[in-house]
């Protein structure tokens, strides 16, 4: 087990230790507070600590043999068992220990190693599940607890992905609207639909087929000049058929185009990846408008490949180990179609889990800890944006009720609110961590801090993983 620590800048007035987790399952925790620094007041008063989750590089990496299925039918009907067996073969006895509860108990071991009586906790995304679990198991050792972008405990784990799908599509529409609002800079169109048309053409150029994602709603500005007298009828017809047209056109093209596969489009996969983070939206616009030269994607190093492999293996094993949401076998045809026929990057992940394919042939090893605020001395703080696609607001309220948390509702739809330069929210987070309370209940969405007209100068951007060498 590896622990990282950044000492409090004002040791004379240090209040304690703040342990953070960035999410996942499978997120690398060790560098969290380096790339997502808390507000200055928190850096002054707390040692910033991260405990690498078990299963990852730095946390005894899970090793797995190569995935090998006799045929596609066996892979679909026994996917979870094959996956578990291949990891068991390479790491005997270890896969069964990969659970959120054990990760929480590892944090408790870290507390002993640090020699402190209480920990303050900051969890983002899946980190909210982990930190709420720790607080439930060890309330006597829990001080402040911040739950940033909270996972719905009732969806663990088969339902989580499908709950995200509508939000991801909605955030892409919001991205198109944002680009259209900056048409003076990007010249991609003055309406979301106009931007989408250029985006769709780029996807088709890269993949050989158009995307199956429906276009944003048409507006008056999208009506052809000759049809202005029938604007409302035109708009209604376009919007009513948008989803069906996109799916049909993608399917026909996929069937007729050798090698046509929308998931081969770097623009499409990057758009889906960055939808929950407005700081990356300018990068999509810059690439789409050809305002910046395309750079060759950076080839990952062997260490990066090892870390990514361990992360993916750990995530799947952990989720199947503690899966509680019933599988929906009726969704198997839709899951196979989305994953194997049209490669729908928006719908495929959720359907893969909801249908039960991801854990097929296995049963859960444990029941997740039922989280609660029993015994906590300080009321937890929960933060969520209203349109967060990755941890939808409605689901986050389930964890809020379970933990009796004070809620700060953030505007917009960014996922993860730490280190976004949101001054009102940062002040509230600092106030809570230092005093144990805050009266703030709402905050605006964070500003976009990425340059709008050029690529960031920082090297090693995570955007390099999205298919373009940004």
Where do the PLM segments sit?
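Glycine-rich nucleophile elbow surrounding the catalytic serine of serine-hydrolase chemistry
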Residues: 28, 105, 123-135
């Amino acid at each position: 087990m590896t622990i990282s620590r950044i000492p409090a800048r004002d040791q004379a007035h240090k209040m304690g230790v703040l342990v953070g987790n960035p999410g996942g399952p499978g997120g690398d925790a060790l560098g969290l507070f380096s790339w997502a620094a808390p507000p200055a007041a928190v850096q002054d008063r707390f040692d910033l600590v991260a405990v690498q989750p078990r299963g990852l590089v730095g946390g005894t990496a899970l090793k797995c043999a190569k995935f090998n299925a006799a045929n596609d039918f066996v892979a679909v009907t026994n996917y979870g068992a094959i996956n578990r067996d291949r990891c068991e073969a390479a790491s005997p006895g270890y896969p069964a220990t990969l659970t959120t509860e054990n990760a929480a108990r590892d944090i408790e071991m870290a507390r002993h190693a640090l020699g402190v009586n209480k920990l303050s906790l900051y969890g983002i995304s899946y980190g909210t599940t982990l930190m709420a679990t720790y607080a439930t198991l060890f309330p006597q050792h829990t001080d402040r607890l911040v739950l940033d972008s909270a996972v719905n405990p009732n969806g663990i784990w088969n339902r989580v992905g499908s709950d995200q799908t509508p939000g991801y599509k909605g955030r892409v529409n919001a991205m198109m609207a944002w680009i259209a609002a900056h048409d003076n800079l990007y010249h991609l169109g003055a309406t979301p639909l106009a931007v989408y048309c250029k985006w769709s053409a780029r996807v088709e150029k890269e993949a050989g087929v158009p995307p199956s994602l429906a276009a944003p709603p048409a507006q008056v500005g999208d009506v052809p000049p000759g049809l202005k007298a029938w604007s409302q009828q035109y708009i209604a017809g376009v919007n009513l058929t948008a989803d069906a047209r996109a799916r049909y056109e993608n399917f026909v093209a996929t069937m007729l185009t050798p090698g046509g596969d929308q998931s081969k489009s770097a623009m499409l996969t990057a758009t889906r990846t960055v939808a929950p983070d407005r700081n990356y939206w300018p990068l999509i616009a810059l690439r789409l408008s050809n305002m910046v030269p395309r750079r060759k994607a950076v080839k990952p190093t062997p260490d990066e490949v090892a870390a990514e492999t361990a992360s993916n293996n750990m995530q799947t094993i952990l989720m199947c180990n503690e899966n509680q949401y019933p599988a929906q076998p009726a969704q198997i045809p839709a899951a196979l179609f989305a994953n194997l026929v049209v490669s729908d990057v928006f719908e495929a992940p959720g359907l893969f889990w909801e249908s039960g394919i991801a854990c097929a042939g296995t049963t859960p090893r444990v029941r997740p800890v039922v989280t609660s605020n029993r015994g906590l001395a300080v009321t937890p703080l929960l933060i969520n944006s209203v349109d967060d696609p990755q941890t939808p607001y409605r689901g986050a309220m389930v964890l809020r009720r379970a933990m009796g948390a004070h809620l700060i509702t953030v505007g917009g739809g960014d996922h993860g609110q730490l280190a976004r330069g949101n001054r009102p929210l940062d002040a509230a987070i600092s106030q809570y961590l230092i005093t144990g309370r805050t009266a703030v209940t709402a905050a605006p969405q964070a500003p976009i801090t990425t340059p709008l007209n050029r690529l960031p100068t920082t090297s090693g951007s995570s955007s390099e993983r999205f298919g373009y060498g940004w």
